[in-house]
Swiss-Prot record:
This is Large cysteine-rich periplasmic protein OmcB. Keywords: Cell shape, Disulfide bond, Periplasm, Signal. InterPro entries: Chlam_OMP6 (IPR003506), Chlamydia_OmcB (IPR051172), DUF11_rpt (IPR047589), Ig-like_fold (IPR013783), OmcB-like_DUF11 (IPR001434). Residues 45-65 are annotated as: Disordered. The gene is omcB. In elementary bodies (EBs, the infectious stage, which is able to survive outside the host cell) provides the structural integrity of the outer envelope through disulfide cross-links with the small cysteine-rich protein and the major outer membrane porin. It has been described in publications as the Sarkosyl-insoluble COMC (Chlamydia outer membrane complex), and serves as the functional equivalent of peptidoglycan. It is present but the disulfide bonds are reduced in reticulate bodies (RBs).
């Protein structure tokens, strides 16, 4: 009885410690120590239970010894294990099972004991709990044992591991591996097995067929220079989503689009079955005659469909033109002439002429116009075919810049509302006016004393001046010794030359100065000569200094 208890506790210890070792909780040294302590405790318990041998003997072959090591791991005795053959040198097999409800359950069976130098088996069984692929089983060989063989065959790695790969393991399927090892010395041989698997997910794809249809609506007739609008309707009448739906509408010959493009492209993206989209396209007719607008729809993997509408463009109803100077100087009046005509064969009614001036423009005169801020308005009840009228507007700009005069004419006729527009742009130039002032700071002075000539250069005009140059010449009584200014300079004898100033802005002032020493008595003179791109003739200014 004592031997039986000791064996049972030994099985419990080895099973539990092996489970913890396999899960990575214990290291080898700790596992061996734990096993020794548990076996010693088993000997003590066996002595205490001697008095109950007879009662326990009857239940000897039916008792299950189960010990919970961790919440996920359970060690059980395999009651159906086959007795070892007489020529084998290992005991009955017992099983360690990982109760894992995820992908793959792994079961490992090893003998209760083995003989040093004689091989014993390690059985590993992987059970699929769901469909998995790329199942990898790794077996850590015992530290003090020699690998003999395995089924399926494999080769140990450098760190003493055996690795098997199962391409696919279905739910409920089993895969068994047997490893034979030979212990090399006495002690506990610990072995660990791990499994890694990828769940296999199967999906169903519903296939359908998109069917994109396109229709177009537009007027049968229109007037020249009056907007013509088309409606393009796109609908998916199929059973699947149409991907990357694109509508292309080339601008027909005789039409113009506000964007200036010759091909209009509309990206509709994906369209679900039954989904409908509407695109509105507006053109301006440029000539009379029949014009056909064609819209083409395409989508990923499908055929292109087209829809077209033909429109007859009638004679023009109204025309407007505006003329004015291309450029002028600031504050100088400029006259614009606005011409409105009816080149068609229909009477125009309720004609409105609107002239919109750019900000910065001031109206000097506009006969017959209603003036509101920067807008001028003329109205006519009728404009007969072939009739033409002119309106004159006198304006001026207060600041330099480019300003545009926009004219729009709106009218009604039997063919609908007719409009026409025109514009004229005038560049208003400023005028540079560069002046110079020369003064000396000390006058009179004694021989040996210094004085400073200051030269202020100012652009009083409305435009910038460029390449502004300054030269100073002094009589023999004054000797230049230093200078300062916005540009570099050089002293040569009694002359100081400053480098050209690239730009002098409107209303801008710069100052030059030259320090001079009185070298002899007399009535000295200093002459400043100023030149620039706008000064056709250089400007000079003279200052005198008395020296005694």
């Amino acid at each position: 009885m004592n031997k039986l208890i000791r064996r049972a506790v030994t099985i419990f210890a080895v099973t539990s410690v092996a489970s913890l070792f396999a899960s990575g909780v214990l290291e080898t040294s700790m596992a061996e120590s734990l096993s020794t302590n548990v076996i010693s405790l088993a000997d003590t318990k066996a002595k205490e239970t001697t008095s109950h041998q007879k009662d326990r003997k009857a239940r000897k072959n039916h008792q299950n010894r189960t010990s919970v090591v961790r919440k996920e791991v359970t060690a059980v005795r395999d009651t159906k294990a086959v007795e070892p053959r007489q020529d084998s040198c290992f005991g009955k097999m017992y099983t360690v099972k990982v109760n894992d409800d995820r992908n793959v359950e792994i079961v490992q069976s090893v003998p209760e004991y083995a003989t040093v130098g004689s091989p014993y088996p390690i059985e590993i069984t992987a059970i699929g709990k769901r469909d998995c692929v790329d199942v990898i089983i790794t077996q850590q060989l015992p530290c003090e044992a020699e690998f003999v063989s395995s089924d399926p065959a494999t080769t140990p790695t450098a760190d003493g591991k055996l690795v098997w790969k199962i391409d696919r393991l279905g739910q409920g399927e089993k895969s068994k591996i047997t490893v034979w090892v030979k212990p090399l010395k006495e002690g506990c041989c610990f072995t660990a097995a791990t499994v890694c698997a990828c769940p296999e997910i199967r999906s169903v794809t519903k296939c359908g067929q998109p069917a994109i249809c396109v229709k177009q609506e537009g007027p049968e007739s229109a007037c020249l220079r009056c907007p013509v609008t088309y409606r393009i309707n796109v609908v998916n009448q199929g059973t699947a989503t149409a991907r990357n739906v694109v509508v292309e509408n080339p601008v027909p010959d005789g039409y113009a689009h506000a964007s200036g493009q010759r091909v209009l492209t509309y990206t509709l993206g994906d369209m679900q079955p039954g989904e409908q989209r509407t695109i509105t396209v507006e053109f301006c007719p440029l000539k009379r005659g029949r014009v056909t607008n064609i819209a083409t729809v395409s989508y990923c993997g499908g055929h292109k469909n087209t829809a077209s509408v033909t429109t007859v463009i009638n004679e023009p109803c109204v025309q407007v033109n505006i003329e004015g100077a291309d450029w002028s100087y600031v504050c100088k009046p400029v006259e614009y002439v606005i011409s409105v005509s009816n080149p068609g064969d229909l009477v125009l009614r309720d004609v409105v002429i609107e002239d919109t001036l750019s900000p910065g423009i001031t109206v000097v005169e506009a006969a017959g116009a209603q003036i509101s801020c920067n807008k001028l308005v003329w109205t006519l009840k009728e404009l007969n075919p072939g009739e033409s009228l002119q309106y004159k507007v006198l304006v001026r700009a207060q600041t330099p810049g480019q300003f545009t005069n926009n004219v729009v004419v709106k009218s009604c006729s039997d063919c609908g509302i007719c409009t026409s527009c025109a514009e004229a742009t005038t560049y208003w130039k400023g005028v540079a006016a560069t002046h110079m002032c020369v003064v000396d700071t000390c006058d009179p002075i004694c021989v040996g004393e210094n004085t400073v000539y200051r030269i202020c250069v100012t652009n009083r005009g409305s435009a910038e001046d460029t390449n502004v140059s300054l030269i100073l010449k002094f009589s023999k009584e004054l000797q230049p010794i230093s200078f300062s200014g916005p540009t570099k300079g050089t002293i040569t004898g009694n002359t100081v030359v400053f480098d050209s100033l690239p730009r002098l802005g409107s209303k801008e002032t710069v100052e030059f100065s030259v320090t001079l020493k009185a070298v002899s008595a007399g009535d000295a003179r200093g002459e400043a000569i100023l030149s620039s791109d706008t000064l056709t003739v250089p400007v000079s200014d003279t200052e005198n200094t008395h020296i005694y």
